[in-house]
Design a protein with these regions (language model features):
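Non-catalytic, usually N-terminal nucleic-acid engagement modules in DNA/RNA processing proteins
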Residues: 1-130
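Glycine-rich phosphate/ribose-binding loops and adjacent secondary-structure elements
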Residues: 133-227
Length: 227
């Protein structure tokens, strides 16, 4: 069997996996059938991270009508709630639905960093309002194309991770995107800022998007051991 999330049946197995809403069956009932190897996994043995589809937004695969992005009860809200409930049904840890700052470099209809940040905060507000605490743990995604914009992004979204502000609905971990995932000066700088803000306390997952090479594994392990 190629069911690599099942150590008893798979030809090989992994204890961790990542699955994106951008490629999934978002109807939980249908997903339970067609993606049973994911949904029926032994959750005591396998940890699954759910990607919200932000990368697909950046590449123009997951399209939003930006002029109606904030319309209450509109089609964008329908997409948001489908992704939110799929993540809660599927994943142990989940990305919020960010609009990556590098989206402006592709054919997405987005032109400015400000738009990406504004729309991400709108999605964060939606997830914060409609999430079921405990169904999945959310990772607050950090983006930014340079130090200045990375600081702007962090300052705008850090409150979503603060239990003093949002109580049990505060996001439980962090995900590093944009320059935060590859520029080591910025990574260390951000870790210090997060530490000083008390926003690494009781955060059990720090995810680096798009990072899989061996050198990064060594460097990130060193950081982890010193946090």
């Amino acid at each position: 069997s190629m069911d690599f999330l099942n150590e008893d049946k798979g030809l090989f197995s992994y204890k961790w996996g990542l699955y994106s809403a951008g490629h999934a069956v978002l109807d939980p009932v249908k997903s339970d059938i067609s993606e049973a190897h994911v949904q029926k996994r032994d959750r005591s043995k396998v940890t699954l991270v759910g990607d919200s589809g932000g990368f697909q937004v950046a590449k123009g695969v997951l399209k939003f009508p930006w002029d109606k992005f904030k319309e209450p009860g509109g089609k964008c809200d329908e997409v948001r709630i489908k992704i939110l409930k799929w993540l809660e049904h599927t994943a142990d840890w989940s990305m919020i639905l960010d609009v990556p700052s590098f989206s402006i470099h592709f054919d997405t209809g987005l032109k400015t960093f400000k738009e990406c940040l504004e729309y991400t905060c709108h999605n964060n507000d939606f997830f914060m309002e409609w999430r079921t605490p405990g169904a999945t743990k959310f990772l607050n995604v950090l983006q930014g194309n340079d130090l200045r914009t990375a600081d702007q992004w962090y300052d705008a979204v850090k409150g979503y991770s603060d239990p003093k502000i949002h109580g049990e609905k505060a996001f439980e971990g962090w995900a590093m995107g944009g320059e935060n995932m590859r520029w080591w000066y910025l990574i260390l700088y951000r870790m210090i800022k997060m530490r000083d803000d008390g926003l690494l306390e009781n955060k059990d997952w720090l995810h680096f998007l798009g990072t899989s090479h061996l050198q990064a594994a060594i460097q990130l392990t060193a950081i982890k051991r010193n946090l």
